[in-house]
C-alpha cells in the first residue's frame, strides 16, 4: 500500500512542478507583451541610422585635388583615381574617380584622411543589385546624394533602442522625430 501512496505523492509533486513551470513561462510571455516589437516591416518602416553610420561614400568632384591619399590609406587599394598633369598650371586634373562597392569594406579611412573633405559617408545602405558591375560607381554616381529616410514621407521611421535612450535624456530634434 505504501508504494501506491508514494506514487500518488510523486505524481502530485510532478503535477505541481509542471504547473509552476507553465505559470513561470506564462508570466515571462506576459512580461514581453508590453514591449515594442523588435522586428520592423522593412520596405515600409526603416530604422534611422546613427550619426556615425558608414554607408555609401559621397564624392564631390569640385573639391578633389587628385592627391590619391584615399588610395594609399585604403586597406584594399580600392579607389581608382585617374588624373593628368596640366603642365601650364602645374596641377593635377582629375579625369576619373570610381569606387567598387562590391569590394569596399566601408572602413571609412578614405573619408577620414581626405585633406579636402571631398569624400563623406552617407546613410544609404541599400546597395543590393542583381549585377555586381552596377556596384562600380564613377564620379557621377558617387556625386548623387541619396534621399534621406527622414525626408521620405512614404516610409515610417523607427528609432533604435540606443536612440530612444538618447531621446529620453535630450530634447527632441529633427533626427529623433518619427513620421506617423
Swiss-Prot record:
Keyword Hydrolase appears in the UniProt entry: no
Catalytic activity: a plastoquinone + NADH + (n+1) H(+)(in) = a plastoquinol + NAD(+) + n H(+)(out); a plastoquinone + NADPH + (n+1) H(+)(in) = a plastoquinol + NADP(+) + n H(+)(out)
Details of cofactor binding: Binds 2 [4Fe-4S] clusters per subunit.
Principal subcellular localization: plastid
Compartments (UniProt record): Plastid, Chloroplast thylakoid membrane
Pfam families reported in the protein's UniProt record: Fer4_7 (PF12838)
Intrachain S-S bonds: none
EC number(s) stated in the UniProt entry for this protein: 7.1.1.-
Entry's Gene Ontology BP terms: photosynthesis, light reaction
Molecular function GO terms recorded: 4 iron, 4 sulfur cluster binding; iron ion binding; NADH dehydrogenase (ubiquinone) activity; quinone binding
GO cellular component, one term: chloroplast thylakoid membrane
Topological type in the membrane: Peripheral membrane protein
Cofactor: [4Fe-4S] cluster
Described function: NDH shuttles electrons from NAD(P)H:plastoquinone, via FMN and iron-sulfur (Fe-S) centers, to quinones in the photosynthetic chain and possibly in a chloroplast respiratory chain. The immediate electron acceptor for the enzyme in this species is believed to be plastoquinone. Couples the redox reaction to proton translocation, and thus conserves the redox energy in a proton gradient.
Family label: Belongs to the complex I 23 kDa subunit family.
Protein name: NAD(P)H-quinone oxidoreductase subunit I, chloroplastic
Taxonomic classification: Eukaryota, Viridiplantae, Streptophyta, Embryophyta, Tracheophyta
